[in-house]
Amino acid sequence: MRLRLHQIPLVAMLAMVACLFTACMSIPERASGSFVERSIEVAGTSHRYQVFVPASAAGGRTPPVIVFLHGSGERGNDGAKQTQVGIGPYIRAHLNDFPAIVVFPQAPDETEWSGNADLVFASLEAATREFHGDPDRTYLTGLSMGGYGTWEMALRAPGRFAALVPVCGGLAHPRRPSMGVSGIAGAADPYAVVAARLKGTPIWQFHGAKDDVVSPDYSRQMDAALKAAGARDARLTVFPEANHNSWDPAYSQTPELWTWLFAQRRATR
């Protein structure tokens, strides 16, 4: 017996359509986390970047998203070096239980993050869309040059990120002016300007007390400015024995960082 379309109850038809739609939109199950390479074109140039995609059991259907900005030594166009220092080694040690999508853009040689904002945001949006990330649980972190880049990107898109984790970063650098955060050079108190713009975003800074590359005073001044501005959640951890490498103790030896970070959600707009 052939069933005519008009004989199917409306509710049943809607249920069938919903099932088909859900099947089309389903996310493949991932037994383990993995790094995948992607490329994106920005201003006519193709850039390779990496994305860590978590195991389905760890990340769920809509995982949080982290953008990681590397330091000077990982610049290039190989599309991989940026996963070898900082957050990448920690993730490799926790492939099956790290719960977040992590986006690893790579700045070209001899450039700063301030000149690569389009690359950062384009790779973030592409990865979030492809892997079904949660835009309200999107976090930004970076080390050294990437710590400067963390402030740069946050200022360019206030409210875009649910939390910031700058590691051994700052706003300006006397020996490398090009690395400084753009748009605040003429301010009488750049720390106060940044704090006023970002006080609504939870921020946890990390630095080494013995850092002779980027002074820990930069993070101390930023922390003081945030608290003076009435910041929603401003934290600073200074590791007493760490030099410039404060990223290993931050990412790999501070488990409470991850508990804190993944609890943050972008404020309802």
What is each PLM-predicted segment?
Residues S56-R61, T111-M145, L155-P158:
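Gly/Ser-rich "nucleophile elbow"/oxyanion-hole loop immediately N-terminal to the catalytic nucleophile
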Residues Q50, V65-L69, I101-Q106, R137-T141, ...:
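Structural recognition of the beta-strand scaffold that forms the well-ordered cores
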Residues F21-V65, T141-L143, G183-G186, R220-A224, ...:
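A domain-start/cap signature at the N-terminus of enzymes
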Residues A163, C168-P255:
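The feature captures the conserved acid-bearing segment of alpha/beta-hydrolase catalytic domains
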Residues V65, L69-S123:
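Active-site machinery of serine-nucleophile hydrolases
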Residues V11-T22:
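Bacterial N-terminal signal peptides
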Residues A57, G71-R75, P108-E112, S144-Y148, ...:
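Solvent-exposed loop/turn segments at secondary-structure junctions
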